[in-house]
Amino acid sequence: MNIGIIVFPGSNCDRDVRWATEGCLGVPTSFLWHETTDLDGFDAIVIPGGFSYGDYLRCGAIARFAPVLNSLISFVDKGGKVLGICNGFQILTELGLLQGALTRNKNLHFICDRANLSIESTKSTWMKNYKKHDSISLPIAHGEGRYQCSSDVLKKLQDDDSVALRYADNPNGSIHDIAGITNKKGNVLGMMPHPERACDDALGDIDGKSILSTLLS
């Protein structure tokens, strides 16, 4: 198993993810600069949090044109696993690999806190270590984490069992309390909470470990 972490100018959670995957789980992990186009040899790709290109225009709007993301589309089509965390989730929606959009938080402020979450679907390969309706708590840190979509898209997400996580106490105004979604095939997961910040036993917080430990099987 080999993991690639895509790094953009402005990414700042790439090393956190590497510590979680390689330091805590022992999975070989490499950084992939946004200009690369070669994803051969990787079993899963993570797009980490941060402020790609300074979040100018809107979150992920510039990053979605990076050369590596053209290769990512082919990677997904072939069944490759992709996880987008926070800014990574925003990029996946801009790229069209996930539906909907992430907009300014309802209170118009940056939120740095913990969020109680409910597991709504285990369809995604990333979620298979949970059971439906499990309760977990993960850190959140975002200014534009309010998930929005049309009524048609919402119905499709629900019909396809693609709502992966919901907030127990919605912190940002996301429609239907949505904190994370998956694509129809289940190999792409986008989520605003940060599982990589809840993987280290030394911190006494490992609720996110079950997501990343799917890389071990």
Curated annotation (Swiss-Prot):
The keyword Nucleotide-binding applies. GO terms for cellular component: cytoplasm. GO terms for biological process: 'de novo' IMP biosynthetic process. Residues 2-217 form the Glutamine amidotransferase type-1 domain. The active site is at residues 86, 194, 196. It catalyses: N(2)-formyl-N(1)-(5-phospho-beta-D-ribosyl)glycinamide + L-glutamine + ATP + H2O = 2-formamido-N(1)-(5-O-phospho-beta-D-ribosyl)acetamidine + L-glutamate + ADP + phosphate + H(+); L-glutamine + H2O = L-glutamate + NH4(+). Its EC number is 6.3.5.3, 3.5.1.2. Coiled coil: none annotated. It comes from the Bacteria. Keywords: ATP-binding, Cytoplasm, Glutamine amidotransferase, Hydrolase, Ligase, Nucleotide-binding, Purine biosynthesis. Part of the phosphoribosylformylglycinamidine synthase complex involved in the purines biosynthetic pathway. Catalyzes the ATP-dependent conversion of formylglycinamide ribonucleotide (FGAR) and glutamine to yield formylglycinamidine ribonucleotide (FGAM) and glutamate. The FGAM synthase complex is composed of three subunits. PurQ produces an ammonia molecule by converting glutamine to glutamate. PurL transfers the ammonia molecule to FGAR to form FGAM in an ATP-dependent manner. This is Phosphoribosylformylglycinamidine synthase subunit PurQ. It comes from Prochlorococcus marinus (strain NATL2A). The gene is purQ.
